[in-house]
Amino acid sequence: MGSKFKIILFCDRPSENQSASTIIDHIDSFKKYSKHEIVVWSKRNALPDNDVLASFDCLIIHYSISLLYERYVSRETLEKIKSFEGLKVLFIQDEYRRVDFACGQINYANIDMVYSCAPIEVARKMYASLNENIILKTTLTGYVPEGICDILLNPTSQRTIDVGYRARKCPFFLGKKGIEKYLIGKYFLDYTNDLNLSSNISS
């Protein structure tokens, strides 16, 4: 394959106005920072024909493409992934959902490497049913955008907001932790009501 690989990045890149800069930055970083040839393939539930796919050395499945749902990966697309003979790498997030099903999909597609957001010891427990030859790695959910690195921040004493927090209501099947994530904001406001804090809480 030589020292420079030809890599196809299978993703669902949002448009710039969809307020998903973290996802966009992560997708764009492959092409921006890799020494290899990166082709960004942003088409939900669609990969190139097998003969085109065969021209690549590596297939990366980005976390914006979920193996859990057919609207992202149909059976036909999964078969293309399975039949791809190069290196297959999966980045996965939201790992609290249908883990056993995800393991089944990963095993079936013969994925070679999985990047999890969990510490490696936890990831090994979560994905215990993966084939033994699959390599597990740990990665971060996101990174600081380059665009804000040079922004000058006010000293803490000059900031108008003491505490900021954002969360959303999660569906019930995400369990206690999903509820607690949302309730933290409400409880914080209740417990600090007499502390004269300037808070910006949305949950």
Where are these regions (language model features)?
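Nucleotide-sugar donor-binding catalytic core of glycosyltransferases
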Residues: 2-56, 63-77, 90, 95-101, ...
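Short, conserved SAM-binding segment of the class I
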Residues: 80
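Short beta-strand/loop segments at the ligand-binding rim of alpha/beta enzyme cores
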Residues: 84-89
